């Protein structure tokens, strides 16, 4: 249970216009710390009674007893620092117990991405869908994730008015933190999205500019339980994730089958490795994969930052960190 100071802090986050996801994350961090504090001290949480040694003990508990990742612990510390700074500004706290508590040092972790060959196999997996309407819809969904690097929620929130094929641009209105951005579209994405628009989403033509119909969702879902399985505007994030996972399984199976036909053992092993990665493919991995492809082909960090919608360049900089596979290849090359 959160004390009155914490509830005031959470209320001002809402007033300040912080995104709902940010508010939920902050509440979760604070609730986790409060629960630990109450169980440790056997009394109700009181922010004015928190001292530096409490925070150091909590860090040790999270790291050694719970095995939490350094990034997770540091995020919690950051939340507590902002809370205490605000409480002092409001004269609800005299001293800041977080002032001398450092973050846990950690080695930067490279965001997990898929190799180009695995992404290509995923794109080809849509051919296994027997319903041409769903196949084109899945191709459009993948085009947004693979070529534009949008988040899965952003893809599901895209409206018809957000896509301008004439100029080859896409407007993402529901970016993280409520930030919107305008993105250039890869030529392959333009062709795929245009084909989906003409044959599935708007076979009778686009709605009039400025009309209410323009605000309808770009992607469609299917009512499988209804006769004829009609399409309806809009697709839930959960369903979109399931489709990507399903396509990942199909692509993995196809690569496994290719491996059994491959005579070259090294090549067969590589195919199986890609198949293994695709078994757990996720939308966010496709976003990471775009960032790595852009950097590998000479893009600058600010360009990647703009595409992905990162607030801080340091977040984008993580893509420069060698992945485990990069290090593995480097070690193999260094052999005698």
Each language-model region and where it sits:
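Conserved catalytic core of the tyrosine transesterase superfamily
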Residues: 1-336
């Amino acid at each position: 249970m959160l004390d009155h100071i914490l509830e005031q802090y959470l209320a001002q986050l809402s007033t300040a216009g912080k995104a709902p996801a940010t508010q939920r994350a902050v509440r979760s961090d604070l609730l986790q710390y409060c629960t630990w504090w109450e169980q440790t001290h056997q009394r109700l949480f009181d922010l004015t009674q928190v001292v530096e040694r409490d925070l150091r003990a909590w860090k040790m508990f999270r790291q050694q007893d719970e095995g939490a990742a350094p990034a997770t612990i540091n995020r919690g510390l950051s939340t507590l620092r902002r809370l205490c700074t605000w409480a002092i500004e409001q004269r609800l706290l005299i001293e800041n117990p977080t002032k001398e508590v450092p973050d846990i040092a950690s080695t930067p972790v490279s965001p997990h991405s898929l190799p180009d060959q695995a992404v290509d196999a995923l794109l080809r997996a849509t051919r296994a869908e027997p319903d041409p309407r769903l196949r084109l819809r899945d191709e459009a969904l993948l085009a947004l994730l693979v070529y534009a690097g949008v988040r899965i929620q952003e893809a599901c929130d895209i409206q018809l008015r957000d896509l301008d094929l004439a100029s080859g641009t896409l407007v993402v209105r529901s970016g993280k933190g409520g930030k919107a951005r305008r993105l250039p579209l890869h030529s392959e994405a333009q062709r795929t999205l245009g084909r989906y628009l003409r044959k599935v989403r708007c076979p009778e033509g686009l709605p009039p500019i400025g009309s209410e119909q323009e605000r309808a969702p770009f992607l469609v879902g299917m009512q499988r339980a209804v006769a004829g399985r009609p399409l309806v505007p809009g697709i839930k994030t959960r369903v979109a994730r399931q489709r990507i996972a399903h396509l990942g399984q199909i692509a993995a199976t196809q690569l496994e089958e290719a491996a059994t036909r491959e005579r070259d053992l090294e090549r067969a092993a590589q195919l199986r490795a890609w198949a293994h990665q695709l078994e757990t493919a996720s939308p966010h991995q496709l976003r990471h994969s775009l960032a790595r492809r852009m950097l590998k082909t000479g893009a600058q960090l600010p360009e990647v930052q703009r595409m992905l919608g990162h607030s801080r360049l340091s977040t984008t900089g993580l893509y420069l960190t060698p992945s485990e596979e990069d290090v593995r290849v480097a070690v193999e090359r260094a052999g005698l």
